[in-house]
Amino acid sequence: MERKISKIQFFQMFMLLLVTGAVCVLVYKAQIRENLHRPLEYTMMTEHKDRGEIVLSREMPEISEVFTCKTPELKKISIECVGKNVAAGAMLSMVLADGETGEVYFEEEKPAGEVLNSRIQKKVEMELKEPLKGSENKKLRLTWKLQNGDSTAFHITANQKNVIVDSFNNQKGDGTNVIYYLHYGDNTCLKGLYVLLCAALLFFEAMCFYLIVMRGLSVEQFFVPAALVLGLIFQCLFTVGSVPDEQTHLDTAYKFSNRMLFVEETENPYTIYKRVCDVEMSDMLTNGLETNSQYLLMTETFTEPENTELVEVPYQDASSLVPGLVYMPAAAGISLGRLLGLSAMLTLQLGRIFNLLAFVLLSWTAIRIIPFGKNLLGMTALLPIALQQGASASYDAVVNGGFFVFIALCLRMGKEERTKKWEFVLLGIFALFTATTKGGVYLPLLLLTVFVFGRNSGKKNQQEKTRKISAKWMITAGVLAVVLLALCIYKFMPVMQSFLQAGDMTADGSGMYTIPYLLAHPLKVVYLYWNTLMKRGDFFLHSFLGGALSWLDFEMSWLFAVVFLGGLLLAANMEEDRFVGNRKQKICMAAACALSAGLIFLSMLVGYTKNNLNYIQGIQGRYFLPLAPAFLLLAGNKMIHVQREQRAAIWMTVLVTEILLVLQAAAMTGMV
């Protein structure tokens, strides 16, 4: 029956949109306007990862880098370095000239001590007197020369740029880069992007109000359009490369794209073929949020690619801890962009869009399958951190969606009196996926199959038959568990071997914790786990709710986090949608989540934590997303009861809060 829409609801929608529009204007005037008329910033240096260095000294007194400037109206170049043993008479000459004609655009010679006389890294700036007109696509030569250096040594941060850098120290093809920042143009040109963002948010808000409040649709019905629209907004806000390790995931997806398109592999296992324009775009994108990425999104998405020839370049493969299947959506999107001859930016965005489609489809399937907790699962999938990962090229899009489906299947089959064959087939597939993903840290989730194989029949006259069937399935489950464990050990044996290597604790803290050491000191493990919870527990919760997005570049206010947490707790206690399992099932679910969390802690302890620390490093809230549908269901209790009629208000509160979060992220991360 069609639900009648009242005039009051139209008035409520109008007022909500009016208030949100006013907030958009307020954010612009209070936070964005004051940052206008500043140069755009392009980070050429790799961030959040290990980098190399070049030493300018008596042994190598001059460095010269020839690069293609891809930015218009170049204004300033910044180089990061640290000076050591700076001699009193040492002089440093800095020159920026045309790489072809030799015309000088910047030239300065200073005593080395004035430029840098510190053991702390510092950015040395070369600011042009006037913006360099026509700098885009111009070859430039950057030269630093040290004179009378004696013991002086400048340790300059460096990385590799495969296409943009033409030569280094006159070595053609050497992509060594020492430039940290390029500042160019004016960020005022990005105001239009903010206007489009606000328009998209208002459309999203109106759509959600219409579907949830006016039409009264269930989460199964409104989830797909809501997730797709909000996911696309997140893609524009968190551009290519701004999600942790996304460049590595794009490299891996590109490898599978080559296989889809029957591109031959290189002779070197550490290189692949890529389009020149795609490599160039990767060189232009940084590991983080910056105005340059927003500018590229605005100007390069719908352009014609300049060079689609294939070139052999180094790449990083991230498929060792996951099945290659998780990269298929992104690889398909990249392949489509290459076949259609689209720009590099649009090709990479298509990879992200296909990943988003996979995440939304898997999450929606889980919502359809799960017998209870539908609203909780939908709200979890729409959390900022879930959408950030789901709308990126990261394998987390498929991994998180796949785990959601597995948990939903276990709960569904545990509730049904008669299970279907397709459910067992699907359960086996996703159980295999669970066992062979992320180093096996989520392997304890297989305990949830107890819901399936340990359930009791509700009819007395079928008890004998049920016992026979249960025995058969328990044997099958046991065999399957052994096979899955063997597959897990086989796939992750190289990683396990590195963890199992014995190692001595180093006095300087440069070593890592190892499994043999931890086995010999079990109390040390207890202390490390406890200290981690006490010191970092608030960060885990905050980042799980979306409190630290991108490469932790944006920190969300706890005001937003409280709303998201409250929404999840209320969703777990909605009428006709709360978990109604017995005590044994709750204990099993809690044990599965606790064991997985313990393995996550252990993996980061032996794989990331220096042995001079008394807590575990590197753990983020997003690592617990695959467990969320299970452990959040345990929040259901008799003290909280949410009536069905209150569902729409809770959903709109959470979604409007997410809109406000996006506005704050745009303002604080430098969209303009």
Task: Identify the function of each model-found stretch.
Residues 1-28, 189-232, 470-480, 583-590, ...:
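Start-transfer (signal-anchor) and selected internal transmembrane alpha helices
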Residues 260-350:
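Interfacial juxtamembrane loops and adjacent helix segments
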Residues 207-208, 346-372:
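Transmembrane-helix motifs of polytopic, lipid-linked glycan transferases
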Residues 409-418, 442-482:
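Perimembrane helix-loop-helix junctions
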Residues 21-100, 118-120, 130-136, 145-200:
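Beta-sheet-rich sandwich/jelly-roll-like modules and their strand-loop junctions
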Residues 218-221, 342-345, 364-385:
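Transmembrane-helix signature of polytopic, membrane-embedded enzymes
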Residues 388, 423-439, 444-450:
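Membrane-interface alpha helices of multi-pass inner-membrane proteins
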Residues 486-576:
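Membrane-lumen/periplasm interface segments of multi-pass, membrane-embedded glycan/lipid transferases
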